[in-house]
From Swiss-Prot:
GO terms for molecular function: dCTP deaminase (dUMP-forming) activity; dCTP deaminase activity; nucleotide binding. Pfam families: DCD. Pathway: Pyrimidine metabolism; dUMP biosynthesis; dUMP from dCTP: step 1/1. The active site is at 127 (proton donor/acceptor). It comes from Methanocorpusculum labreanum (strain ATCC 43576 / DSM 4855 / Z). It catalyses: dCTP + 2 H2O = dUMP + NH4(+) + diphosphate. This is dCTP deaminase, dUMP-forming. It comes from the Archaea. Belongs to the dCTP deaminase family. It is an enzyme of class 3 (hydrolase).
């Protein structure tokens, strides 16, 4: 079941869903608008291969900065954070979707990481890309996406109880932590 506006506001007011900071004006009929934070991380162009199992390759040739805005260049991939910290209970999951007005500028909000598990707490790392032929400026604090909340049965092992929860309590835009997975059944 997808939560509607009054349910979203009620769940947040009662502390069942944590949104910090929370602005009631951002509650939409079937979602909650979320805003862009001020931390940005991106890869510099080069020919070095990124190997998801080699931590050092995940972090080389990266730049990061905090700022009130960021100009996303055509074709550029940039990680950004949400302004809001999101905390979910063990029976609510969320998906993040882009805002239509932002998409119409050529900005994709996430590549594939749009699912937020029950039990997650932290800022959400956005995997943004500019498919426009022109640079697009995005501002910290601007509504950039929306969270849709789904009520499920209580899960047996929510994200905050998983021993390998790599992104629990993350703050700032977070580079992939795929290197923390073990190689299994690889020939």
């Amino acid at each position: 079941m997808i939560l509607v506006d009054w349910e979203i506001a009620d769940h947040i007011k009662r502390g069942y869903i944590g949104i910090d900071p929370f602005d009631p004006a951002l509650v939409q009929p079937n979602s909650l608008d979320i805003r862009l934070g001020n931390h940005f991380v991106w890869y510099e162009p080069c020919d070095d291969v990124i190997d998801p199992y080699q931590k050092e390759t995940l972090h080389t040739h990266t730049q990061e900065r905090k700022g009130s805005y960021f100009d996303i260049q055509p074709g550029q991939f940039v990680l950004a954070e949400t302004l809001e910290t999101v905390t979910l209970p063990d029976n609510i999951v969320s998906s993040i979707e882009g805002k239509s007005s932002v998409a119409r500028l050529g900005i994709a909000l996430h590549q594939t990481g749009g699912w937020i598990d029950a039990g997650f707490s932290g800022t959400i790392t956005l995997e943004m890309c500019n498919s426009n032929c022109r640079p697009v400026r995005v501002y910290a604090g601007m509504p950039i996406g929306q969270l849709v909340f789904y009520v499920t049965k209580r899960c047996e092992c929510p994200y905050d109880k998983k021993p390998d929860a790599k992104y629990q309590n993350q703050k700032n835009a977070t580079i992939s932590r795929y290197d923390r997975k073990m190689l299994k059944n690889v020939e």
